[in-house]
């Protein structure tokens, strides 16, 4: 009898968690604005620009008919610095810094101008292929984070 009660409570708990209708904030594609144009500095980091552009293309396609339209201009940079070295002078830890300076325009008027910087520290790897793959994953994650911050700043602009 005791095991039966525990199982029932467990099942009810799982059912209540699954039915809470949690959705991430950026999965909702019903924003009150549209993205008219996204432009990137030609000297910016191509991989970072591609990731940010792909993330905003989703918003741009869904919200094409909105009255409020914004244009976004982005300049991205990437730096890799050596944080620590071993006794031989070989790098042990790296820091990858991804930054973006972005401007949001509405009717050709600047309404927001900000700088975002995201950092990640990681260990060196003797296998350079794995190190390069790890760096690509880190760059993608930092770039997604930056695009989420840009989108959040536009959402808060539109709420005001």
Write out the residue ranges for each language-model feature.
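Short hydrophobic beta-strand segments
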Residues: 34-43, 71
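Short Gly/Ser/Thr- and Asp/Glu-enriched loop/turn motifs at secondary-structure junctions
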Residues: 67-69
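Bacterial Sec signal peptide processing site at the extreme N-terminus
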Residues: 16-37
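Amphipathic, coiled-coil-like alpha-helical scaffolding segments used for oligomerization/assembly
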Residues: 157-160
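Short extracytoplasmic
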Residues: 42-58
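Surface-exposed short loop/turn segments
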Residues: 54-59, 63-64, 73-140, 144, ...
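Sec-dependent bacterial lipoprotein signal peptides
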Residues: 1-20
